[in-house]
């Protein structure tokens, strides 16, 4: 008799923004899922805050990147293509080397930020992906698990489940943040409006990538 060994990996991330979004500034806003189609999303907004930002020009496309820090040692990097349908070419070139280069180009500036509230859940079988990457000896009848147990077992599925919830998560410290905005009212600000598909990368301060995903529409995880 063959006994099936099911390997399960789960990722959960939730953290408070270092500079929280005020719920009173959240409102419905058009989000372009394609150049010809848009839907309304709950768009979070903050004004005149200081964030690391860069406008990047590459042969495969131009985009903007911003770092939104969390309390603690993590931050979310948002990569927004200049073109509404420019996400795929950036994804294809999202290598470790390129990502580090883009992060090194960041400069602090005052920015008005608009980004959707979103929840992303997913469940994926990683077997095909891992086999394509060369990890073939652990799956099916070729796997040798004699050091783990005396049964005839095989790994037939590797399920990866994800969940991320991005919302305002503001605290009492938000009042002090508002004071900073008024102090800097005369400062020239830029705008980072996430109104079409984007990539988000959650990373640790030491550079380790904790989570990578994309948001294409409020109705699908794409």
From Swiss-Prot:
Q: Which Gene3D superfamilies match?
A: Alpha-1-antitrypsin, domain 1, Antithrombin, subunit I, domain 2
Q: Which InterPro entries does the entry mention?
A: Serpin_CS, Serpin_dom, Serpin_fam, Serpin_sf, Serpin_sf_1, Serpin_sf_2
Q: Which SUPFAM superfamilies match?
A: Serpins (SSF56574)
Q: PROSITE patterns attached here?
A: SERPIN (PS00284)
GO CC annotation, single: extracellular space
- What cystine pairs are annotated? none
Q: Name one GO molecular function term.
A: serine-type endopeptidase inhibitor activity
Which SMART domains does this entry report, sorted A to Z? SERPIN
Record-stated family: Belongs to the serpin family. Poxviruses subfamily.
Which PANTHER family did the record assign?
GH10112P-RELATED, SERINE PROTEASE INHIBITOR, SERPIN
Please report the name of this protein according to its UniProt entry.
Answer: Putative serine proteinase inhibitor 2 homolog second part
Instruction: Supply the source organism's classification.
Output: Viruses, Varidnaviria, Bamfordvirae, Nucleocytoviricota, Pokkesviricetes
